[in-house]
């Protein structure tokens, strides 16, 4: 397989995927096997796109095209392909496109990943578990904390053709969390597949934190949310956003909710401007698409 790309008018780059993965390198052998299985199954069209967005799951795959439309962009017109990796397997594919190395394919690549804050107890044999942004570094005497993809974000920050983007390091968690955090008053998000629909809608109608918390049903998960947010030093505005985002995150199924949200957001966009409800694309996705399409 030989891949020809033209990143600049009049310039031709030649990529040789076969020679990128070294047979005497164990990591490369594993990566090559994964890439071969993946491409044989569904994704050979990535070689024909001008630019690529690698995502971890179906929610990003379904929502990115409509997010682009809200930014007055069209991924199809820009020949951008969204590739769902089905997990955190970016490293296997980035070897194909890393232009710091010879024989690679010169395409602009964005990798979208969740920041996923997590913590583990300062005790032997403990594992990291997911935590909320407002719990991060709140109890350093008893927990260690970390974010996902710190290494990758730094590694590719100045790369010629690859970038990693994720949610805000202070307030972010996942795509679904950020959608609600940046749209805390947007009822478009309350699709039929959202459980606890009436509860979240009632919370949205309140501005006072105590009144919002009073709308939440009793559960261990909700008690943790309320206790942790109450201990946070964030502003009331950020606490309100976080409370709604946490409740929303725990009430959605990624695939079905993303499909319904895609339909609802497109229908909103198709209305006359005066009739549209306000919706904000999560900022990390705005940043990613701005870089990719520049």
Task: State what each model feature region is.
Residues 1-5:
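Structural recognition of the conserved hydrophobic beta-strand(s) that form the central parallel beta-sheet
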Residues 9-294:
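Acidic, divalent-metal-binding catalytic cores of TOPRIM
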């Amino acid at each position: 397989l030989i891949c020809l790309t033209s990143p600049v008018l009049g310039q031709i780059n030649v990529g040789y995927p076969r020679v990128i993965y070294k047979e005497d390198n164990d990591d490369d052998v594993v990566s090559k096997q994964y890439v071969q299985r993946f491409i044989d199954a569904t994704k050979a069209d990535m070689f024909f796109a001008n630019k690529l967005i690698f995502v971890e799951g179906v929610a990003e795959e379904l929502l990115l095209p409509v997010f682009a439309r809200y930014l007055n962009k069209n991924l199809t017109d820009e020949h951008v392909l969204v590739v769902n990796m089905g997990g955190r397997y970016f490293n296997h594919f980035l070897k194909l496109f890393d232009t710091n190395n010879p024989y690679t394919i010169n395409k602009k690549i964005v990798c979208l990943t969740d920041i996923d804050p997590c913590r583990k107890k300062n005790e032997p044999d403990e594992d990291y578990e997911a935590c909320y942004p407002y719990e991060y570094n709140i109890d350093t005497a008893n927990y260690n904390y970390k974010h996902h993809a710190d290494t990758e974000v730094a590694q590719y920050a100045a790369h010629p053709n690859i970038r990693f983007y994720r949610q805000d390091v202070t307030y972010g968690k996942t795509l679904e969390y950020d959608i609600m955090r940046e749209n805390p008053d947007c009822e478009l998000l309350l699709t039929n597949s959202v459980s606890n629909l009436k509860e979240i809608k009632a919370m949205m109608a309140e501005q006072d934190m105590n009144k919002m918390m009073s709308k939440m049903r009793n559960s261990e998960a909700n008690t943790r949310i309320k206790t942790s947010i109450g201990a946070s030093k964030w502003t009331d505005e950020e606490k309100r956003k976080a409370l709604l985002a946490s409740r929303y995150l725990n009430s959605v199924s990624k695939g079905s909710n993303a499909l319904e949200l895609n339909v609802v957001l497109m229908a909103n966009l198709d209305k006359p401007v005066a009739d549209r409800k306000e919706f904000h694309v999560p900022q990390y996705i705005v940043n990613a698409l701005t870089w990719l399409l520049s």
